[in-house]
């Protein structure tokens, strides 16, 4: 045999073919010939390598170097550098998502290293059209053993011992199925391979057939020996041309070598295989429908019993297994059932191949032991979710399966656990979905698929799937009504119980599982006409506006920027947002996460454009609003929720008095967010506009102290409680009460209340500060401490990607010189003479997943260390201080120290006169959600009063009509988001000047033109 110094294994699966591997291979051969290397280096087209996301792929054997995403233009350089000069081309190595280092070796890449290959043991290693390469890797050895050394009963016993269960979906024990067929009387029996892989997102069987067809043929021969069959069929859909081609080649080679046909290996055993091409009907994946199709009839299921093992194809005993099941058989017989059962769980033995696809970085084929956790498959092997998005759920089992949500990432993926969670293993399609997927729309999609694929033979499936689809479609279109969810559940139960075959019996699974885990989304679609994923387009004008908690007309004000009408743009913003300047600086801009421009390049900088308008527009004069209502309203707390509610109620004619315990209004806007992010003049200007409407704001007035609770209750007709969450959570460690230990909120409040004292040095943090936490308050505290002259280290117990703080704030902190230490947890604060001198910490590693989808930090024993510091700032969370509420008030406080509110009136407490909102109800949240809570509370309060008085609902006055221009560039060219100008880090770290400088006119106009105007109605 000719020896080559290198074999270049080029992936030749359908996925890589689609990515251009055929052209890459051709040029590779040409370049090697051109340089006279064809006698030293051999190019081999293999089957699917498995890492479909990175194709075209080439492995250099025996070096083990793997090249990915090869383009035709890369090939000449690659040949010259690697095979002529001996310098591997690093830019074509694999790079893990979010990391810069490139990995040259295949076995160092987590996608490959963490798998356990049994079915896929030959993937990417052999030429699937060369039987000799298969034989060289123990191919047909299991078959030879079965035919020459074992009786049919021994073959069945070995398969039973292995614990192998059918990999086509049902999970029925393979050995038991074979035993039934073996014991069925009859001279004619059939072995059938189900290669009719019809699940959306599934490509396991196709890839096995393309990469290792002989493994399937070997398994079929062994099955034939076990049951006494002489003829077999592979039922493969015609839309798999490459798989069919390679099967035909494999069949021809096997016959030529005496491994198929008459007298196999001289044993006197006869068996041959025929390929039957199916038309691609999903129902033909059901075993009796598949057999009916082979018989030349329309593929429709038959009632059972009799079962196929007794009367299957042409009423003869038949065994049907899918591709993956049969591909296991050769190795089970060769190595023994105990070897196979050595991995997996007690009831689910061996490995399972998954087609990992959807919203995951490493799309491809994954083979892992049964019992591997869902999180390990998606994150450790799959590389997590692209684009910084959050995992939502995984659909397992295709249209017949169910979704497994984020709180079950630690779930063991085996037959029993998957069924317990409401899904099925299916053939192994694993579709990962991020937060941008709608659970209701997903259920509608799969029901639409099942409805189309229903054969129509039985009424429950034929009519039931159509009726369920109608209901789901109506919900997605905003036409859902109360009772629809319960009706879906009822119909699903009937269909599951009454349908003839597996298609109908499992069709309701996606609906039932999404209702089970995402019932709130169904309710939002029906009651609120809202799709939180911004998918169901009938429910909104544009994704950005729909995602904004207050529904700002974002496309409108961006269009007005483009038209240079900033005054009108400002008016549009003020319709829904009383704090546009504030939100242009500190909003968490969730709208941008749903901006469709982000699918092309980067989202439109909505937040920065909002700021541009508020910084540059002429502000309209605010005039007092007359009091037209007799009812008086008290608001407790002058934060964004309280002030928004006050403004809305004043505009409805109510007399409103706001009680604020701090010296100035604004809540966390004034007392928590530092001025380098939100200058006080900007905030004060927008609060003054609310005052001008006639809202009275009494500062330095704490309810329960300066004004008794009883007096508020007596003097006012309604009270809105919006005190915010101004109390830091304690760390719960020894030494927390030493001097020099601050809560994050308390430190920021103290600084903002006494800036001169801190700046003059009367108050000091010392030279070294440790900040504990990873949220926005932690970053704010750290950057404030830095500006006061300290050397600052942030200690966070997880990784950077887990930090709740805004990504841009983390980057800004790092640019300013703040050090962030990850996987660190505080053990205790150490001190001397009653003052903190250090913090003892423990290093962490990541364990399993918590309910939020983040990995839990686990302590590393013996990793303790002490960090010498002068001050410790604990910013690990906040809670409301509701101590001002008397126990006898009738206002209930829940176990999270937040107000309890009713379901039917979203902001009404357990005392009907008292309403509540903002952080005091939800816990620490965002500015824009607090504003939304204020809007909602004003509507609830006004509605409750009017209903009590027997009055009609409030009708808002007619608004000024503002013409919104519609201009969209005919050709959309990729263009990144405009960069926000900032003060230089070395300068800004020494003062509290505003860091972000705002867009200039040309920047704003250019950014505004990037808007795709998703609000357009066609």
Where are these regions (language model features)?
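Hydrophobic alpha-helical positions that pack around
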Residues: 244-370, 382
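A conserved FAD-binding loop/helix module that cradles the flavin
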Residues: 781, 920-948
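Ferredoxin-type iron-sulfur electron-transfer modules in oxidoreductases and energy-metabolism complexes
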Residues: 1-7, 21-45, 62-91, 142-159, ...
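FAD-site-proximal beta/loop scaffold in flavoenzymes
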Residues: 737-767, 849-924, 963-969
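Rossmann-like dinucleotide-binding cores of NAD(P)H-dependent redox enzymes
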Residues: 655-698, 782-828, 951-965
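Glycine-rich dinucleotide-binding loop and its adjacent helix/turn
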Residues: 612-626, 685-705, 728-788, 893-910
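Feature captures the FAD/FMN-dependent oxidoreductase FAD-binding
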Residues: 627, 632-636, 684-733, 828-840, ...
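N-terminal Rossmann-like FAD-binding beta1-loop-alpha1 element of flavoenzymes
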Residues: 631-657, 778-786
